[in-house]
């Protein structure tokens, strides 16, 4: 059979050539028969139009009415980020009252990290960074001693950093010490832990026996203690129990403890826990302002907000780990928002995926939802937000000047832990034509600036109105179980640095000419860290 003839007659070059090449007989093309078309059938058209009109008058029910409602994208993300906990009782704790569980059952001896007072700050920092789930190094007098004399954590590292780069302005009695530490750091001399003990206020050391019951730890944590030491009968430290570890325990094992599990279904609004006295910082303030704020107020984290007071991120003392490389020192002069982007980028590299941890809840969130986020983010607190406020689109320049000059002493104002430096945090006024903000809060203070357009802000969270910490949650657990924890404000006051000590609010003030690269020798920490974000 002639291929060209078949192709020409078929009118379909592709199909005919393919079939002819295989030696398959090709039938002649089918002619379109006009009688088969409805184009010449007016009656059919009329019937079709009538049927169409009837369908419009009485449309059939939508199949969507019979479909199960789908999860919203936000609900799906929440489910992925916080999967349901195991609903099967743990044989180890089933049928037991949590107050009958001993502290030693939660001890993990492998998590204890030791250093002696003569160890250098650099070496102690490496112990703190590398695979340390407790985020603390226990310090003893000598390598052979088993008695804990102090601790070294990220708050201490933050205090040391501020002294080294010349941002802390000490009291008169500490001027010589601060100058000596700065001089040794620039000369790349080892600085032992013994010499930096007075740089930050220490939390009270609380030790409990491994044979003590969990209610004693609960009472301590509900009183504001962040961690306790677990000791053996011989007095040796065999573990460190933190607030996070205990909250995580009750979250994972809640099915075994009905009294605790019932609380998880309650709304934060109904439980009335947390505080509405908030300390926050604006997103375009220098990172050093956030570090100084945490140091002077004894905080482990601070909310970063835009001009509409919408939460755009969170900076914690643990994030200081990203500043222990000499190459990262220029970040100190960058904005808080820029540092948040560095934190997110670092998380993405560590976990192999993009991540945006959520550090906020709302008054209608359940306690269980809040605890799930605390456990997932390993954070000490969740910011409570309401519906997002519009964020103005304007250059990132302050609308207001600080209430006092940068070099003037700070006047005390009321904050979460007592007096706060009003030169560093002020409440921006609302525009005259703006609606009244929901739930106006007394003593609520913030820094001032305008969020640049395009940066994440209002659409990510909402207006900051309060905060719920692990101390608040464990205090609730303790009181609901008949315990009597003391007032957490006593521990908060202890962690605060003396308000009489002044600090420089910005690198753009008296020390704007600091050469950070000349300070980088103070660290000498040129290594790549692989450790769990907390």
Curated annotation (Swiss-Prot):
Ranges of Pro residues composition bias in the record: 428-441
GO cellular component assignments: cytoplasm; nucleus
InterPro entries in the cross-refs: AMPK_gamma/SDS23_families, CBS_dom, CBS_dom_sf, Ssd23
Compositionally skewed regions (Low complexity) per UniProt: 9-27, 388-403, 499-509
Region (Disordered): 1-45, 388-447, 481-509
Gene Ontology MF: a single term: protein serine/threonine phosphatase inhibitor activity
Location of this chain's protein in the cell: Cytoplasm; Nucleus
Record key words, sorted: CBS domain, Cytoplasm, Nucleus, Repeat
BP GO annotations: cellular response to glucose starvation; regulation of mitotic metaphase/anaphase transition
Start and end residues of each CBS domain: 107-172, 199-259, 274-331, 335-391
Main location per the UniProt record: cytoplasm
Membrane-spanning parts: none
Role played: Involved in DNA replication and cell separation.
Family membership noted in the UniProt record: Belongs to the SDS23 family.
Name this protein carries in UniProt: Protein SDS23
